[in-house]
Amino acid sequence: MLTQSSFWRSLYRLIHIYAGIFIAPFILFAAITGLLYAITPQFEQAIYKDVLYVEPLNQTPHKLSQQIEAAKQVMPKSAQVIEVRPAPSSDQTTRVIFSDSIHDFTSEAVFIDPFTLKVQGHLAVYGTSGVLPFRTTLDQLHSNLLLGKWGRFYSELAASWLAILTLTGLYNWWKRRQNLKIRQTQKNKLLRWHSTLGLTLFPLLLLIAITGLTWSEWAGDNIRVARQWLNWQTPTLAISLQTDNLPTVMHHEHHEMPHSENLNLNIVSTEYDTALSIARAHGIDAAQIQIKPPTSGNQAWTIAEIQRKWPTQADSIAIDMEQHKVIDQLAFKDYSLVAKLTRWGVDAHIGVLFGWINQLVLALYAFALCIMII
């Protein structure tokens, strides 16, 4: 007769075994595509080198408004600027991003040499992170198998069961650790290797599973509801110029870029110069920033820092351009601990938080996970 202890031991063992048989292939595919995604920044910079980089000149760059006008020359008159990312350094281009009413979640970015106003090229960019086509393909392969919404079942399944496999694996190791040391069979040797890798990767396995679930289709929605209920959500700028402030929606990597519903606001390019000047005067000092014009007449301009590499710079500001007045400002240092951990967790998951070291750790993790599964 099974005791309560042996019942639970058998149950967790069976869960681990059968999940390994039926779910591990999905986790293996996620690990392989995650490994490829982790090393894409270097490939992306090489593939799009002529678009992303310029020869720095010993002169002052042209005004941002002039760069925007240069970008408009190669786009249809109906195209509307929805975002501008000034060149973060003297050897990089400025991105002027236009709406794309045809393709969901993508926009068209025109890359401008800030010194010569030459158009270096234009590419489709995806999501609020502005990911370029090569990485977009790998991103979607990793997150939805290139199958759209229904493909997200796979990644949610992989992330959910990765956490379960990790915890049941730890439990099984704890209960069998003495037997593995005493009985020197070939099977036990393999189990020891499997257990050693699992224990070594344990913190990363949970981190990847949890951060992966935060932007999943169904669990992600529940996590956002729970964070809101616990008052752990990421703070949002008040961008409404009326008393009933309407918040912006702050997305992370992998999320969609919503298209504006009303872009006919007669915005002139020189307003970008003014917005940039006001933002710099109010402490928005990161090299990587994005400037977004309002999408309706009762909304403010928003300027946000988008430096995801440590130390994170994610301050943001909302400006009433009619009065040249700041109506709201958020500083990353004032975020709650949970909001900061969410930001850092997501950035670590996609390999940008600690640069090449982050990428190397993720690549080694993905490789070791593949070995564990195989």
Can you describe what each PLM-predicted range is?
Residues 1-374:
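Conserved histidines in hydrophobic membrane contexts and catalytic metal-binding motifs
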